[in-house]
Amino acid sequence: MARKLFIQTHGCQMNEYDSTRMVDLLESSHGLEPTDNPEEADVLLLNTCSIREKAQEKVFHQLGRWKKLKDAKPDMIIGVGGCVASQEGDAIRDRAPYVDVVFGPQTLHRLPGLITQAASTRELAIDVTFPEIEKFDNLPEPSVDGPSAFVSIMEGCSKYCTFCVVPYTRGEEVSRPVQPVLKEIQHLADMGVREVNLLGQNVNAYQGVGADGDTLDLADLIRLIRDIDGIDRIRYTTSHPVEFSEALIQVYEDVPELVSHLHLPVQSGSDRILAMMKRNHMVLEYKSKLRKLKRIRPDISFSSDFIIGFPGETDRDFEDTMNLIHDIGFDMSFSFIYSARPGTPAADLPDDVDMEVKKQRLAILQQRINQNVQDISRKMVGSTQRILVDGFSKKDPGQLKGRTENNRVVNFQCDDTDLIGKFVDVTIAKAYSNSLLGTDPRNPS
């Protein structure tokens, strides 16, 4: 009987991508088959996130639950990867001594050796170093699960925003060379993938070495991907406003395969708070870039990230954030109450915003964003949307589902399963809180 692998993933899309690569890697090296049931697994891996304090505590709570499984199956291997592993390797050793393997985001390619080492020595095997881009040279070809796929094009971040742990847990920015990225995407296209989502902690800082030794940026890379037969939709995430260049804006005019949606985290609408965060731009600069995009793509939608209650945030600062949300009309966005991360410059600032005030501000902001989301969805009713059909509806197996360019799930009645993996035009008949209902699928391609 094949041995089983269970992976639980916390955090960002980069972690989701890394987890899929771990499955490919360990299936190749150890013959491990993925399972959705941790109780039947021989190897349990936790791919972690350390952006928020609660996310970090979730790791140790989960490990405590897994300890019971290991007590019943002593040969089970438990591994912790991701950003918490990079930041808290010693703490994991102290708080969860039953963990067998600790590895960082840049060393997941060494996971087979670490597992073998831990199994033979029954001692902790740990590697949280930063060997730059080496991991991509040591991974098997990616497997495919549906018509959409993530592709990591760079790692790390060199911006050192005062609140953020990413430079310390994933290292500074390192870009993959252009040709391996194109080769991976060509492989995905050959396997039936129609949409790629380019990933990086600061993806628009991409500076990859091309075939001729020249350096290409994200705009250049998107133009090359556009020419790969079979790839008809391109996304990327996550971007930084400072490096949202004129060349990248121009791509929205030249490359129709690039979706009319942009996630561009701003964090705050207050110039004073942005300076304290070391974001290195002002609100007016941010708005100016979005206005240029709006002139090129009038139907483009925007989403963002917001941190509420950053040290020193006043009522006026929060009002500035709400004014920005009103001016831009942000679609689905992520918002969080500020939590100090150890080792970051902001952790030395007095956390002087009362928690009740933070909660009130977060509720106000989320209510406004949710209203925007519902308004945008309602305005889509009656329109024709091109969606990529990716499978069956979760609630009704008689329906197929797909996603719009602005990332909304559309369910529609259809028994033609040949549409899965194809683009179709559907008419939006109704808007629900978390999805849309489509009718009359046509023009499959």
Swiss-Prot record:
Chief place of localization: cytoplasm
Cofactor binding mode and count: Binds 2 [4Fe-4S] clusters. One cluster is coordinated with 3 cysteines and an exchangeable S-adenosyl-L-methionine.
Ranges annotated as spanning the membrane: none
SUPFAM superfamilies in alphabetical order: Radical SAM enzymes
Function of the molecule: Catalyzes the methylthiolation of N6-(dimethylallyl)adenosine (i(6)A), leading to the formation of 2-methylthio-N6-(dimethylallyl)adenosine (ms(2)i(6)A) at position 37 in tRNAs that read codons beginning with uridine.
Subunit record text: Monomer.
Descriptive protein name: tRNA-2-methylthio-N(6)-dimethylallyladenosine synthase
Native species: Alcanivorax borkumensis (strain ATCC 700651 / DSM 11573 / NCIMB 13689 / SK2)
Biological classification of the source: Bacteria, Pseudomonadati, Pseudomonadota, Gammaproteobacteria, Oceanospirillales
